[in-house]
Amino acid sequence: MNAWNTIYDQFNPIAFSLGSIEVHWYGLAYACAIVTAFYMALRMIQKDPKRFPIERKEFESYFLWAELGIVLGARIGYILIYEPNSSYYLTHFWQIFNPFDSHGNFVGIRGMSYHGGLVGFLIASYLYSRKDLKKLLIYLDLIAISLPLGYVFGRIGNFLNQELVGRIVPKDSHLGQIIGIMVDNQLRYPSQLIEAFLEGVIVFLMVMWAKKHTKTRGLLIVVYGLGYSLMRFIAEFYREPDSQMGVYFLNLSMGQILSLFMVIVSLGILLYATKNSKK
């Protein structure tokens, strides 16, 4: 057993307190994710204005729409897909975004679905671009580049918050014994960090490679969608399935099933992008 294995015993997920409000590292990590994505996008606009002919003010307005769509979609998606008491929230809709518990204590909003956030993002992007759909693919490509590195901070936030834990490390896994984290007296894979690397860093490199080798608008978001789906599918083998969900057909987790649907959506965007490139 090394110091890394027991890091959760030595780490407080609460960064600091403001009166009765506890600020978690989780929240700070997500703030870093948003800031990273925002400035990464601005850098791309400045560096490649021909590919991303968007004014800063225009992008700032779009970014607000996209963020709102992501938050709404992620939270509602979690309620519909993962929340065992979804019927309660559907009849008490205001509770979906209530950051206080029954005692009035600030606990934040917990329970977000990445795939739900993706749906919300696509809807928000379409609504914002509906008056000029020619810009839709430009916006999507821009987010495809700026999102992955921000996503890394999001998964680090999950790790610091000690949630979305990994599967139990087999006793015969030498690497697992080294990188595993003790959770409830069981050594588990640090699945959040595995996801940060695969779904963040690797997907970012995929999109940057595509940016270098293609000029067709819409292909970057397609590469992102397909790359993320593949990396998430792999990472799910190290992540403990949600206790209320378990596994399904062929022992696939809900995350893997939703990633397969994401492939279909990505191929649909590919058809749309290919069709528009010929106009």
From Swiss-Prot:
Protein topology in the membrane: Multi-pass membrane protein
Cellular compartments annotated: Cell inner membrane
Predominant localisation class: membrane
EC code(s) of this entry: 2.5.1.145
Family (UniProt): Belongs to the Lgt family.
Record-level Gene Ontology MF annotations: phosphatidylglycerol-prolipoprotein diacylglyceryl transferase activity
NCBIfam families to which the protein is assigned, alphabetical: lgt (TIGR00544)
GO CC annotation, single: plasma membrane
TM stretches of this protein: 14-34, 62-82, 106-126, 136-156, 190-210, 218-238, 252-272
Protein role: Catalyzes the transfer of the diacylglyceryl group from phosphatidylglycerol to the sulfhydryl group of the N-terminal cysteine of a prolipoprotein, the first step in the formation of mature lipoproteins.
Database matches in InterPro entries: Lgt
Gene label: lgt
One Pfam family linked to the record: LGT
Protein name: Phosphatidylglycerol--prolipoprotein diacylglyceryl transferase
Keywords, comma-separated and alphabetical: Cell inner membrane, Cell membrane, Membrane, Transferase, Transmembrane, Transmembrane helix
Protein origin, superkingdom: Bacteria
Binding positions (a 1,2-diacyl-sn-glycero-3-phospho-(1'-sn-glycerol)): R155
Protein's organism: Helicobacter pylori (strain HPAG1)
GO biological process: lipoprotein biosynthetic process
Pathway: Protein modification; lipoprotein biosynthesis (diacylglyceryl transfer)
